[in-house]
Amino acid sequence: MGTRLLCWVVLGFLGTDHTGAGVSQSPRYKVAKRGRDVALRCDSISGHVTLYWYRQTLGQGSEVLTYSQSDAQRDKSGRPSGRFSAERPERSVSTLKIQRTEQGDSAVYLCASSL
């Protein structure tokens, strides 16, 4: 039986308004075999232009993986280049992709948005 990698995906809220609307992520959690590709989607709050992806590994603080303002992507971490990427196919959507998952990728991944 192959080794499985568990990636928890949780909701991140940053700059939410009084209506309670927030970002949504899918899937909410993901279990993947080592070596498989994973894609996580984030839908931002309407009107927010900046989207952030964070990662929190067990026993560690959160780290910014990447953020984008409109279509401009900025890398803010020492994440393994080539395996992690984020795309912004629409103004309000970002997709974090992890290629060839490894044991060390097991973490909580969350997104947030701001004006």
Swiss-Prot record:
One matching Pfam family: V-set
Gene Ontology CC: one annotated term: T cell receptor complex
GO biological process: adaptive immune response; cell surface receptor signaling pathway
Cysteines joined through disulfide linkages: 42-111
UniProt key word Cell membrane: yes
Residue ranges of domain Ig-like in the record: 22-115
Subunit structure: Alpha-beta TR is a heterodimer composed of an alpha and beta chain; disulfide-linked. The alpha-beta TR is associated with the transmembrane signaling CD3 coreceptor proteins to form the TR-CD3 (TcR or TCR). The assembly of alpha-beta TR heterodimers with CD3 occurs in the endoplasmic reticulum where a single alpha-beta TR heterodimer associates with one CD3D-CD3E heterodimer, one CD3G-CD3E heterodimer and one CD247 homodimer forming a stable octameric structure. CD3D-CD3E and CD3G-CD3E heterodimers preferentially associate with TR alpha and TR beta chains, respectively.
Function: V region of the variable domain of T cell receptor (TR) beta chain that participates in the antigen recognition. Alpha-beta T cell receptors are antigen specific receptors which are essential to the immune response and are present on the cell surface of T lymphocytes. Recognize peptide-major histocompatibility (MH) (pMH) complexes that are displayed by antigen presenting cells (APC), a prerequisite for efficient T cell adaptive immunity against pathogens.
Name the record gives this protein: T cell receptor beta variable 7-4
Organism of provenance: Homo sapiens
Organism taxonomic ancestry: Eukaryota, Metazoa, Chordata, Craniata, Vertebrata
Protein encoded by which gene: TRBV7-4
